Amino acid sequence: MTVERMPSSLGGATSHGHLLELIRSADGLSRQQLLSTTGMSRATLYERLDTLTRRGYIYEAEPLTSTGGRPSRKIRFEDRGRVVLALTLGQTHGTVSITDTTGRQLRSKTFELEISAPADSVLAPLVDTGRKLLEQGTGETLLGIGVSLPAPVEAGSGHVKHQTTIPGWSPDSVVQAVKATWDLPLVIENDARAAALGERNSDAETVVYVKVGTGIGCGIVVEGSILRGAHGSAGDIGHIRMSADGPLCRCGRHGCLAAYSSGRALRDRLGHLGLAKPEDISAAAATGHPEVLQALADAADVLGRALAATVTTLNPDRLVLGGQIGALPGFVEKVSSRVLTDVVERIAEGMVVEAGHAEDLAACHGITTLVMRKIFAPEAVDQLFAEEADSAAG
């Protein structure tokens, strides 16, 4: 079982990378605060701060409040004018965002798409939109690009695996499309996993995020890190078999959870009402349509049965439901009721079941976090410094 740990540095707890991580995680620290926190000698600390400043990682900001004497100045992470390009794709729509280094959207555009269409027809407009949004900024520096997809993604390479959702795409379609335009750090992640990371309130939390849109996806975050599993398939709950003789799933088996509770399953059940998309179903539910409400209740009940096992296994702090179907108030309540009925009290004690933020916002925040970790994690910074030192030594 693999947990994608938050990176650790090659150089120890007082390396350049760890010092930058300490500064980046705070809202500014004085030199005295850094001396007290790190235990470093003044000479060593100041040398490393000078190096990080020269290389553009940090800067000295406004003075801290002082009760007397010379006011101290904050040492802050250099995030001014630095942005990330986030492409968050669902099965029927996508959002292109320019974010700051915390994942806050500065500019964005959302439009409809069909993820099963050929890769070029989906990705080319996204890349073009990203380029245009970047051109609207003034004096911004693009640090990297993050892409979230409704498909399994291989950690590290960013290659798409088991392409049921996007059958016409090659494993490296996304990598090629992005790298053809930007030669910058790139992170590609499953959409539910990115959203799970974006939904966490702190790195101490265990969060299970379930997206119910056209399909069903699940992301699991433990202590700030994505749980991937032995082969990268942790959280693929859509193909849990709920019944041997249930409805046919797209994977070819009968009775999968997705065949009962996904937006696609609801569309098949409610097709005679002309409800073709998840947003059509949610709109009909908002009007109180009795057949739609019953279908949603049935889907939520089956999903709750499956999630009871997930909750019992992981004992999360929060179970978050997202997606155009999953975040519907009545749907969340039905899932919560079934989960709390099926798990023992000590497992459910203190657990919060709730609707998430808008799915694009959660995934956008999560994918930005992953891009920032890739670039500025202690091990990444220390590795860069080590390589430069080796190169200088000749």
Write out the residue ranges for each language-model feature.
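ATP-binding/phosphotransfer module of carbohydrate and carboxylate kinases, centering on a glycine-rich
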Residues: 1-127, 131-136, 140-141, 257-394
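Short glycine-rich anion-binding loops that position phosphate/pyrophosphate groups of nucleotides
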Residues: 64, 150-153, 213-215, 325-326
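Short glycine-aspartate micro-motif
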Residues: 84-88, 142-146, 207-211, 217-219
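Short, acidic Gly/Pro/Ser/Thr-rich loop/turn segments
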Residues: 92-94, 152-154, 217
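Short, acidic, Ser/Thr-enriched surface-loop or helix-capping motifs
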Residues: 100, 155, 221
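Glycine-rich phosphate-binding loop and adjoining helix at the ATP-binding site
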Residues: 105-206, 330-341
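Glycine/GP-enriched mid-protein hinge/lid loop-to-helix segment characteristic of carbohydrate kinases
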Residues: 108-110, 117-122, 169-290, 394
